[in-house]
Amino acid sequence: MAHSIGNGFPPGVFSQLTRRQLVQNGVFGAGALAVGSLGLPRAARALDEINFWATGTLDIGDDGWRTFAYDSGVKVEFTDNGNDPGPVVAKLAAGNANDIYDVAGLQGGSEKELARRGLIAPWDISQIQNYASVWQWAKDIPYLTHDGKAYGIPTVINADSIIAIRDKAGSVDSYGAIFDPKLKGKTAMEDAWINSVIFTAIYLKNSENAKIAEPGNLTADELGLVMEFLIKHKRDRQFRTFWNGWEQGLQLLANQEVWVMTGWEPIVYAARMRGVDCYYAVPREGYEGWANNTILLKSAVVRGRTKAAHQLVNALFSGFYGCKLGLLRGYVVPTDNNVAYATAHANAFDPAGVRKLADHVKQKFAGKIYWQNTRPDNFQLYETWWQRLRNA
């Protein structure tokens, strides 16, 4: 169970979270090694109970889920899936996850693979009334559909870039700062190809005129170019480290071992709470966009929980969940219902703050965005190259 997350960003909670962590194993080959047996919640007994298996940062805590159940009529048993796409998909494909959970939340990119194998079911959008309120550009996110059917619901969105310490790094507006020899030994990237490769590809495409078509889905030649670039800089000791997991990334900033690094925006919130004057840079090359999408597991249909699953998703867009999640994580559920809910419940949420957060994310997506892809065409080659980087 993942109900231990409280208000704010306590690092202990996130020490095991790797929100867009390296997919270390293939799903149907080496990935089977990651399946194991799950630590299982109690099985949902009633048709109005849903076992929700999603990224820990999507949890809103016991009090939040109680309010959610009161408003929606759906009781939620939340379990953190770690959001490492490789093991999650493997547990759905070869493990027992589909026997236990009803609805899952996962970084976008795996929907088509899961749908083709019959592991997830399509959503009936007509049963999700609040889906009409979802921002259109969120509905247009890649990876949501397969064969004309909706398999992913864009529940949480954001765009990632660079974290910089103001009095050490000054004004940063380019990923080039990560590779700047003047900052040698004071930069870092995440130990995850699903983030670090696309950041590097975005930089090379836009600032070094590299012939890269789609940074989120590199050809073999493009991937080789990007990885050789990273390996060279690693050997030159440009990077302090490749960080892994929430706590390490936060600690690097808190101790000021690193002055500039690619990373997640909630790390900025947490570092500021520790007194670090850091900021999230606006990169001239563009952001890495991502969405955590909600998927309907096929076994939930067999167990007769389709109606409750659709009620759950509808309630995610009703406003309360978006307000609560924004307060806890600084993440946005892409609907204006959040502002409407905050306005109607100003004793619990600050309407101006909710609107400001929404405008902040909208502003990011009004610029240049390259979508993260957790399952690029050559994902196994990505894994091979990333291991070479680690060994370099």
Predicted feature descriptions by range:
Residues 1-21:
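N-terminal secretory signal peptides
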Residues 18-35:
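N-terminal export leaders
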Residues 47-113:
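Early extracytoplasmic/lumenal segment of secretory-pathway proteins
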Residues 58-62, 105-111, 115-248:
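Extracytoplasmic ligand-binding site segments that recognize negatively charged/polar headgroups
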Residues 161-168, 202-203, 291-305, 324-327:
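A bilobed periplasmic-binding-protein/Venus flytrap-type ligand-binding module shared by bacterial periplasmic
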Residues 223-233, 274-298:
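Periplasmic-binding protein-like
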Residues 296-366:
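Mature extracytoplasmic/periplasmic domains
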Residues 359-392:
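Conserved C-terminal helix/tail region of periplasmic/extracytoplasmic solute-binding proteins
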